[in-house]
Amino acid sequence: MTNKERVAKAIRHMNTDSTPYSVHFTQPAYETMQSFCRNPDFYDTLGSYICMYEYSDFREVKPGYFQDHFGVVWNRSGADKDIGIVSNQVLSQPSLKGFVLPPIDERAIRRLIEDGFRSNPDKFNLYCIGFSMFERAWSLCGMEDLLAYMVLEPSFVHELMDQIAEYNLCLLKIALEYDVDCIHFGDDWGQQK
């Protein structure tokens, strides 16, 4: 049984000969583990059953500040060095006038997936869209403003969510040309019931 088969069986609540797992680290924790293990490639020795591919593009615009492909600038100079805190407001008004979705680097997505498949053929392949809907919307507008717009400007929120959804569908169309086993959406919304 391959690791891919073990994960698929576990998802279907079927017994497996071992318990599938996947380990991920924040960047500071990753660096701490590299130092602790005295091995820069320690992650490759963990035996994770899952490979996750995520298209993201951050560039440092000043020390500790990173801009994503939507134009959101994340302050990673404080305690949160992994994701950061939004330090700008791309959509400061409830209007999409002048707002353009970022281009999708199809070649980069294909390279990411193909390289992952080549190096991890027996693992469960997961394509991830982090900040998929609600998180992308609040990162563009600001949390408080987006929540207010949901009540005061619902047509704007619908239009914004439609554009984000269309963008994500373009990402999915590319990813689903490959034999990915799962799509992971990174929104933190839901309930415990």
Where are these regions (language model features)?
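N-acyltransferase acceptor-side catalytic subdomain
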Residues: 21, 35, 46, 72-76, ...
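Residue-level "edge-of-site" marker
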Residues: 56, 80, 188
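Short, solvent-exposed loop/edge-beta patches enriched in aromatic
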Residues: 15, 45-51, 61-62, 119-121
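Active-site loop segments of alpha/beta catalytic cores
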Residues: 1-33, 67, 100-193
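An N-terminal domain-start capping segment
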Residues: 35-45, 85-99, 129-140
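A contiguous, low-structure linker/loop signature
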Residues: 60-107, 119-124
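Segments that shape or occlude catalytic/ligand-binding pockets
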Residues: 26-59
